[in-house]
Curated annotation (Swiss-Prot):
Its cofactor is heme b. It comes from Artibeus glaucus. The lineage of its organism: Eukaryota, Metazoa, Chordata, Craniata, Vertebrata. CDD domains: cytochrome_b_C, Cytochrome_b_N. It comes from the Eukaryota. Component of the ubiquinol-cytochrome c reductase complex (complex III or cytochrome b-c1 complex) that is part of the mitochondrial respiratory chain. The b-c1 complex mediates electron transfer from ubiquinol to cytochrome c. Contributes to the generation of a proton gradient across the mitochondrial membrane that is then used for ATP synthesis. The cytochrome bc1 complex contains 11 subunits: 3 respiratory subunits (MT-CYB, CYC1 and UQCRFS1), 2 core proteins (UQCRC1 and UQCRC2) and 6 low-molecular weight proteins (UQCRH/QCR6, UQCRB/QCR7, UQCRQ/QCR8, UQCR10/QCR9, UQCR11/QCR10 and a cleavage product of UQCRFS1). This cytochrome bc1 complex then forms a dimer. This is Cytochrome b. Its main location: mitochondrion.
Amino acid sequence: MTNIRKTHPLLKIVNSSFVDLPAPSSLSSWWNFGSLLGVCLGVQILTGLFLAMHYTSDTATAFNSVTHICRDVNYGWLLRYLHANGASMFFICLYLHVGRGLYYGSYTYSETWNIGILLLFAVMATAFMGYVLPWGQMSFWGATVITNLLSAIPYIGTDLVQWIWGGFSVDKATLTRFFAFHFLLPFIVTALVMVHLLFLHETGSNNPTGIPSDPDMIPFHPYYTIKDILGFLVMLTALSTLVLFSPDLLGDPDNYIPANPLITPPHIKPEWYFLFAYAILRSIPNKLGGVLALVMSILILAIVPILHVSKQRSMMFRPLSQCLFWFLVAILFTLTWIGGQPVEHPYIIIGQTASVLYFLIILFLMPMTSMVENYLLKW
């Protein structure tokens, strides 16, 4: 008799996606981050749901409701810090996942890649709105500064900002709508994840070599299920360690001060995972130019498949491109550091240099290096 997992209308979808799915035999640990992101999303939705049961999205009570969660709700402190640090873990996995895609040429699956970029934007929007909800100083001023950037859009900018604010400043209406969207977006992200997986399973996975692996496939279960479970354990151990030993390591102390529109914090900055984009924004003296550079710093990923001129898909056998890739990683770390520094000499010039190099590497140096490698291989 045929196994029920192969005949049941619902189970056979699960079976073809997670059990009998043919997978390349050479996948390294860099392929673990997709499933880790799934776990992060699950943790965020669960902890967020329980936090929403106790949170109030009103400017008068939002800060106190978060304090109440931490002090009076059973394991409320654990929920709050799991949610806050879970977001950091989410972005660590996201950036590593995107980095893996760039290194091994996974972007040649253009549908999967483009849905991934859409997912990145959706998760960033969710995280930004979530950061506003505790209604601390950095929440309020971060929301004010970032939403105010939209006023740089010609003609409609000012009206657009006031429409998003629901008034003439960030206030109760802004907080309420941000809470509504912050609750809704993760479910949209979940739907996009399903589309992402649908497109991925149309083509099958890439592998470290970048060579088609059709002749050498193995079933996803038990090989990669066990491997993924090990990844879950490692990540959840790291997250638990962060939450239980140093929950405020990645947060901003200013967010423990209730929001006050009359006092501006000395350094307004977003969470660490947005600092690289924030540094690029600050590097350009013109407001509209800065906003365009900020958007392009992420949207540039969409043109990476067009810029792929190498005869080889993966960077595994391309040492020159590898050097350039790791230089790009170093630039991103530099930008993250600069984003957290005050706007003064020498940080300004370092930020501007790193921003120029970031775009230069992706737009010009990587394609040129690929051409040189093609020539060296006499193709």
